[in-house]
Swiss-Prot record:
Gene Ontology cellular component list: cytosol; riboflavin synthase complex
Reaction(s) catalysed (UniProt annotation): (2S)-2-hydroxy-3-oxobutyl phosphate + 5-amino-6-(D-ribitylamino)uracil = 6,7-dimethyl-8-(1-D-ribityl)lumazine + phosphate + 2 H2O + H(+)
Organism of provenance: Shewanella sp. (strain W3-18-1)
Protein name: 6,7-dimethyl-8-ribityllumazine synthase
CDD domains membership: Lumazine_synthase-I (cd09209)
Binding site for (2S)-2-hydroxy-3-oxobutyl phosphate: 86-87, 128
Gene: ribH
């Protein structure tokens, strides 16, 4: 039996973090979590990390697509926070953001980690950005590091 799995160390990985400015008090904590994880666990150097800031979650897929098309990165982390309000706007924004980022990953055969909070309340978002429920930015970075290595392993073995 052949088992393919990745580890989380990726010293030479070039990573782009595409981050929404909307709800910045939350997403800055997600960014801190992602950066800490990339550096501490992945051993990724500052020189290999590029942060791209966009206005909101809807803009994340387009920026991620441009980053992917450059061919300069091994993976992308998308960070943002979409909080449900009293209108259907949440469903459109969260759904299109998720779908667009998945499309980028498949189109460019590049890992795109989804670190976009989609919560019903501001309290839930706060919990997921570094308090009770961990830091989803850090979790997205772990996922990305592992997928970078999994795809490299697959390329070597297949």
């Amino acid at each position: 039996m052949n088992i393919v799995q990745g580890n989380i160390e990726a010293k030479n990985a070039k990573v782009a973090i595409v981050i929404s400015r909307f709800n910045s008090f939350l997403v800055e904590s997600l960014l801190e979590g992602a950066l800490d994880t990339l550096k501490r666990f992945g051993q990724v150097s500052d020189d290999n990390i590029t942060v791209v800031r966009v206005p909101g979650a809807v803009e994340l897929p387009l920026a991620a697509r441009r980053v992917a098309a450059s061919g300069k990165f091994d993976g992308i982390i998308a960070l943002g926070a979409v909080i449900r309000g009293g209108t259907p706007h949440f469903d459109f924004v969260a759904g299109e953001c998720n779908k667009g980022l998945a499309q980028v990953a498949l189109e460019f055969d590049l890992p795109v980690a989804f670190g976009v909070l989609t919560t019903d309340t501001i309290e839930q978002a706060i919990e997921r950005s570094g308090t009770k429920a961990g830091n989803k930015g850090g979790e997205a970075a772990l996922s990305l590091l592992e997928m970078v290595n999994v795809l490299q392993e697959l390329e070597q073995q297949l």
